[in-house]
C-alpha cells in the first residue's frame, strides 16, 4: 500500500495534473505543493463547474483534506489572497483547510518587475516566463537574501530586511534594466496588511508529514509544471526555476526521500509546450491545429496558445528515468478521436546521422534533432467520457499498449474527459 503518492507531469507541463490530484484526494488526508509558485495553472471540473488553481493545492475543494504549501514553493501574498478570496466567495473555508511552511520564500512586487525587465532585455532570446516573479524569487532564495513567510513574525526586522533587499534590486532595475524603481513603502504596507493571515497558517510541515507517516495517513504530493522543465534536468535554459522531478518532493516539503511510495506520471496522449525551447515533434500543419482546437490548448495561467505535436516517447523515457515512475495516468486520449493515423516518436536522428533513444540535456544540443516516428491506425469512435477499458476502440487500446511497451511503465489511470468522473482507475496508487 502506498501512503505517500507523488503526482507530477512527465512532459512540459499542462498534462492534466490538477484533475487527477483532485480525483485521488478522495482518499487523502493531506495534499502538498512542493515546488513552483502561482505560475502553475491546475484546472478542475466538478459537476460541470470549473475551478482554476494557481498556488493553492488541488485538494482545497474537499472538506476532509488539509492542503499544504511546502517550503519549495515561492509564495506571492497577493496571489494567495486573491485565490483565497475567490474560493471563499464560493463558500469554501480556505483558512480552515490550508497550511504553510514558514520557509516559503515570498514573491513581492520587485520580483515581478525584475522578471518582466529581464525578459524584455533578452529580446528574441526570451525564455517565455509567465512574468509572475518566480525566477527572481528563487534567485533571491539561492543568494540567501530572500524574505520568507517566517520573517513576517517580526515586523520590525522584516521592514529592515525589505529595505535592504529593495535598495539592491531597485539599483539593478534603474541602472541596468533602465526600468522604474519599485516603491518600498507600498510593498511594505501591502505585505504587512496580510502578514497576520499568513503567519496564522504556518506549521512545521516536515514534522506534520512525519507524524502523518507514522499514523499511516494518505498524503498526495502535487507537482507543478513538468519534468522536462526541471531546472537541472530540463531543456536548459528554457526551463522553470524549480525541481519539477520527484526529487523535489523531499527538498520541497521535508519528507524523507525513502518514504515516497508511488510516483504517478501524468502523460498527455500527445505533446504540448508553452513558450520557447526545443520541441522535436511540434506540428505546424492542420494536425497541429486540430490538436490545439480539440484539446483547448490555451494556458490556464497565461491564456497563451500552446504548441502542439505528437507524443514523444524518447522524452517521456527521460521522465521515467528521472522520476522512477511507478505508473502513468494517460490524459486527453479523446483529443485524438477522429484522426486517421496517430504517430509516436520512438527515436531521434541527430544532425550527424546517428539514431538515439535518449534526449540531449542542454537546449543547444537539441538543435537539428529530427523525430523518428512509428505510425499507427487512428480511430473514428469517440472515447470521450468512456469509463471502462472495454469501451475503448481497439486502435486506442493498441496505442495505449504501445506506449507501455516503449516506456516500460504501466498506464494505471486513463482520463477521457475534464470531469473527475470521466476517468478509469485501473490501479489505484494508494493500493499499489
Swiss-Prot record:
Its cofactor is Mg(2+). GO terms for molecular function: adenylosuccinate synthase activity; GTP binding; magnesium ion binding. It catalyses: IMP + L-aspartate + GTP = N(6)-(1,2-dicarboxyethyl)-AMP + GDP + phosphate + 2 H(+). It is an enzyme of class 6 (ligase). Substrate binds at residues 300-306. GO terms for biological process: 'de novo' AMP biosynthetic process; IMP metabolic process. Its main location: cytoplasm. Binds 1 Mg(2+) ion per subunit. It comes from the Bacteria. Transmembrane segments: none annotated. Its EC number is 6.3.4.4. The keyword Cytoplasm applies. Keywords: Cytoplasm, GTP-binding, Ligase, Magnesium, Metal-binding, Nucleotide-binding, Purine biosynthesis. GTP binds at residues 13-19, 41-43, 306, 332-334, 415-417. PROSITE patterns: ADENYLOSUCCIN_SYN_1, ADENYLOSUCCIN_SYN_2. One of its GO terms (cellular component) is cytoplasm. The active site is at 14 (proton acceptor), 42 (proton donor). It is found in: Cytoplasm. Belongs to the adenylosuccinate synthetase family. Plays an important role in the de novo pathway of purine nucleotide biosynthesis. Catalyzes the first committed step in the biosynthesis of AMP from IMP. This is Adenylosuccinate synthetase. It comes from Salmonella choleraesuis (strain SC-B67).
Amino acid at each position: 500500500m502506498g501512503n505517500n503518492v507523488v503526482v507530477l507531469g512527465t512532459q512540459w507541463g499542462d498534462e492534466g495534473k490538477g484533475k487527477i490530484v483532485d480525483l485521488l484526494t478522495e482518499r487523502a488526508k493531506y495534499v502538498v505543493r512542493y515546488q513552483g509558485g502561482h505560475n502553475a495553472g491546475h484546472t478542475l471540473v466538478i459537476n460541470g463547474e470549473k475551478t482554476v488553481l494557481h498556488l493553492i493545492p488541488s485538494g482545497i475543494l474537499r472538506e476532509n483534506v488539509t492542503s499544504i504549501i511546502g517550503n519549495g514553493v515561492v509564495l506571492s501574498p497577493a496571489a494567495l489572497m486573491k485565490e483565497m478570496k475567490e474560493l471563499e466567495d464560493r463558500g469554501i473555508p480556505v483558512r480552515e483547510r490550508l497550511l504553510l511552511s514558514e520557509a516559503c520564500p515570498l514573491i513581492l512586487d520587485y520580483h515581478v518587475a525584475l522578471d518582466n525587465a529581464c525578459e524584455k532585455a533578452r529580446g528574441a532570446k526570451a525564455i517565455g516566463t509567465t512574468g509572475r516573479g518566480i525566477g527572481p524569487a528563487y534567485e533571491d532564495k539561492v543568494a540567501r537574501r530572500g524574505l520568507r513567510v517566517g520573517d513576517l513574525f517580526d515586523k520590525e526586522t522584516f521592514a529592515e530586511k525589505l529595505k535592504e533587499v529593495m535598495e539592491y534590486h531597485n539599483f539593478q532595475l534603474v541602472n541596468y534594466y533602465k526600468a522604474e524603481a519599485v516603491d518600498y513603502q507600498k510593498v511594505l504596507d501591502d505585505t504587512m496588511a496580510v502578514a497576520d493571515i499568513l503567519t496564522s497558517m504556518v506549521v512545521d510541515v516536515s514534522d506534520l508529514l512525519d507524524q502523518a507517516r507514522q499514523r499511516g495517513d494518505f498524503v498526495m504530493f502535487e507537482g507543478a509544471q513538468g519534468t522536462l522543465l526541471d531546472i537541472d534536468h530540463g531543456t536548459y535554459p528554457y526551463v522553470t526555476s524549480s525541481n519539477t522531478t520527484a526529487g523535489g518532493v523531499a527538498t520541497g516539503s521535508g519528507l524523507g526521500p525513502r518514504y515516497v511510495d508511488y510516483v504517478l506520471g501524468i502523460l498527455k496522449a500527445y505533446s504540448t509546450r508553452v513558450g520557447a525551447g526545443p520541441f522535436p515533434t511540434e506540428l505546424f500543419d492542420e494536425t497541429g491545429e486540430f490538436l490545439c482546437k480539440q484539446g483547448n490548448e490555451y494556458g490556464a495561467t497565461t491564456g497563451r496558445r500552446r504548441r502542439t505535436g505528437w507524443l514523444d516517447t524518447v522524452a517521456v523515457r527521460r521522465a521515467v528515468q528521472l522520476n522512477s515512475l511507478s505508473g502513468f495516468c494517460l490524459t486527453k486520449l479523446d483529443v485524438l478521436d477522429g484522426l486517421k493515423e496517430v504517430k509516436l516518436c520512438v527515436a531521434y536522428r541527430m544532425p550527424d546521422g546517428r539514431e538515439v533513444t535518449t534526449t540531449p540535456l542542454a537546449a543547444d544540443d537539441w538543435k537539428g534533432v529530427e523525430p523518428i516516428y512509428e505510425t499507427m491506425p487512428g480511430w473514428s469512435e469517440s472515447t470521450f467520457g468512456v469509463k471502462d477499458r472495454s469501451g475503448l476502440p481497439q486502435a486506442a487500446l493498441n496505442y495505449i499498449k504501445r506506449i507501455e511497451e516503449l516506456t516500460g511503465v504501466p498506464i494505471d489511470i486513463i482520463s477521457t474527459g475534464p470531469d473527475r468522473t470521466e476517468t478509469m482507475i485501473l490501479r489505484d496508487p494508494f493500493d499499489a
